[in-house]
Amino acid sequence: MPVITMKQLLEAGVHFGHRTRRWNPKMAPYIYGARKGIYIIDLQKTLKLVEEACDFVKSKASEGATMIFVGTKKQAQHVVKEEAGKCGAFYVNNRWLGGLITNFKTIKPRIDKLIELEEMEKNGELAKLPKKEQSRLRKALEKLRKNLGGLKAMDRIPDIIYVIDPRKERIAVAEANKMGIPVIGVVDTNCDPDPVDFVIPANDDAIRSIKLITSKIAEAYLEGREGVSFTEETPSEPIQSDSSEEEEGSLDISDLFEDTDLKEEE
């Protein structure tokens, strides 16, 4: 059974790329064509690459691999937290702290401090302190929660990293590359796909697109960990395309622009 269907991809606006003046030529193999100044992503390739990424995640998760979801852009923050929470993955949705992967030993004490302060808050110790000290520690706690709240259970660097928009998360991607950690990325038409091991060409600005792809990665991770199946029973609806020219039986590219609001560029 397919992990995802063509209908789902279309309805979520996954096919909307950036304007043609804002593109990376390295994304050309993943582009179906262009119309009205906007690139259209080849969903036939997206469909295949989502399947490949999910198969990889499921396989590694079944072996006990850990995973971190990274999405700090506004549209991705809630989705990343929600989906990582569902599958038990770590997440970063506010700011990537430099050295999180390459120098984890300097980050771990901050995670430990977060856990310590939360325990103090829970058992009432924090409330017993002088008001000035309380205020200082509560501010520190709020900051730690914002940046490290999704990493409290992480005691070593992750085995897989999933990023939404590798262009924005370039520091996280660079650290993963340096440490030899496989990178799965939702890659839009303005990104460089080279640093990403598992490219998922997709709209990385629309919430519905981000939600759809991220939920499938999360389901694959959970399925690998617990053996729960989430695959779709509805068969996919393939698009016949291998270039910007329309062929007999292919999707009419003009039909893809009915919901242009699905591209929520920053």
Curated annotation (Swiss-Prot):
Pfam families: Ribosomal_S2. GO terms for molecular function: structural constituent of ribosome. One of its GO terms (biological process) is translation. One of its GO terms (cellular component) is cytosolic small ribosomal subunit. InterPro entries: Ribosomal_uS2 (IPR001865), Ribosomal_uS2_bac/mit/plastid (IPR005706), Ribosomal_uS2_CS (IPR018130), Ribosomal_uS2_flav_dom_sf (IPR023591). It comes from the Bacteria. Keywords: Ribonucleoprotein, Ribosomal protein. Residues 243-266 have a biased composition (Acidic residues). Residues 231-240 have a biased composition (Polar residues). Residues 227-266 are annotated as: Disordered. Belongs to the universal ribosomal protein uS2 family. HAMAP family: Ribosomal_uS2_B (MF_00291_B). This is Small ribosomal subunit protein uS2. It comes from Pseudothermotoga lettingae (strain ATCC BAA-301 / DSM 14385 / NBRC 107922 / TMO) (Thermotoga lettingae). The lineage of its organism: Bacteria, Thermotogati, Thermotogota, Thermotogae, Thermotogales.
